[in-house]
Every structure is written in C-alpha cells, then in structure tokens.
Amino acid sequence: MAETAYTPRLRTEYDRKIKSALTEKFGYANVMQVPRLDKVVLNMGIGEAVNDRKKAETAAADLSLIAGQKAVVTYSRVAIATFKLRENQPIGCKVTLRKAKMYEFIDRLINVALPRVRDFRGLNPKSFDGRGNYSLGIKEHIIFPEIDFDKAGESWGMDITVCTTATTDDEARALLTAFNFPFRQ
C-alpha cells in the first residue's frame, strides 16, 4: 500500500498561496525564480564552555531538542589569550535544518516561541544581510516548549539565520512576511 508522505503546513501554504502571490508581485518569468526557504541555521555560543566542557554538551542536547535533529559541538580554531581560550576547546554548538524540519521549526518559532518572549514588539526589519538572508537573536532558549523551564539549569541565547534563495532583501522580506514573520512596523 502506498502511504502519503507528510508535508508540513507551511510548505503546503507556500506551494498553494505564497508562490503565486510572489510571482504576481515581482513579475517572475520562470517558476524557479520565485524565492523559497533554503535552510535555517541555529547557533549557540557558550562562553562558559571554556571552563566547563559539560556546558557545551548540555547546550547541544537542548539545541537538539529544539531542532529535532542532532546538534554539533563547535570548537575554537585559534587560541585567544585574553579570553583564556586554547585551540580546539568547545565554544558552542550549531545545527542546520532543511526541508520538512526547517518548515516545522519556523512554524513553531513564529506561532509558539516568539509570542513567549517577554516584551516582544516584533522582529527587526533591518536584520537582512543584503543577499536575502535574515538573522535574529534570542536571549533565552527556554522560550521553546521543548525545553522544560524547571530542568534547564541555565538559559543561553541563540542565533537563528533563515537563508532564502531571494536575491534582494525586498524579495526576502516579502517571502518572510508571507510566512507571517512578525516584523516591526
């Protein structure tokens, strides 16, 4: 028997509504010119991991819970004496999401995690890099429902980069606005 493959809600919405709306707005001649989400990179920089290796492993475990995919511990490449940092010491962790997991994460970020941020007034609309990618920072990783507030010993910040195939910031802004990213006015 053939089973139907699972398609994330945001991917279905992109295929049905967003793609045609962007084609109409920007007047693309080819369907492949329409910008789409490429990947989402989650990064946690753990400064305290220099003194305690367990903190990097704990952060990687938390990031794996948030992303639904195993996180990789990142190591320093050069020694910096002022930070008491030697080469190949753990300093953080990261994970790259693509395809279905990417759409699921963005759905949870927009609808569940960002509304839980204290004094949230919207995302900064100027955080595009000039090539159609958007980056945002979160001060506490405990805003995600996968992290139990009581069991989390510490709360770390994290960087989230949404990479798109858009060539300009305006195209990327239109794409992310169509995905209901809550930008400040």
Curated annotation (Swiss-Prot):
Protein name as it appears in the record: Large ribosomal subunit protein uL5
Recorded name of the encoding gene: rplE
GO BP, one annotated term: translation
Single GO MF annotation: structural constituent of ribosome
Lineage: Bacteria, Pseudomonadati, Pseudomonadota, Alphaproteobacteria, Hyphomicrobiales
Originating organism: Bradyrhizobium sp. (strain ORS 278)
Free-text function comment from the UniProt entry: This is one of the proteins that bind and probably mediate the attachment of the 5S RNA into the large ribosomal subunit, where it forms part of the central protuberance. In the 70S ribosome it contacts protein S13 of the 30S subunit (bridge B1b), connecting the 2 subunits; this bridge is implicated in subunit movement. Contacts the P site tRNA; the 5S rRNA and some of its associated proteins might help stabilize positioning of ribosome-bound tRNAs.
Superkingdom field: Bacteria
Alphabetical list of Pfam families matching this protein: Ribosomal_L5 (PF00281), Ribosomal_L5_C (PF00673)
Xref: InterPro entries: Ribosomal_uL5, Ribosomal_uL5_bac-type, Ribosomal_uL5_C, Ribosomal_uL5_CS, Ribosomal_uL5_dom_sf, Ribosomal_uL5_N
SUBUNIT field: Part of the 50S ribosomal subunit; part of the 5S rRNA/L5/L18/L25 subcomplex. Contacts the 5S rRNA and the P site tRNA. Forms a bridge to the 30S subunit in the 70S ribosome.
Any one Gene Ontology cellular component term annotated for this protein: ribonucleoprotein complex
Keyword rRNA-binding annotated: yes
Family stated for the protein in its record: Belongs to the universal ribosomal protein uL5 family.
PANTHER family per the UniProt record, alphabetical: 60S RIBOSOMAL PROTEIN L11-RELATED
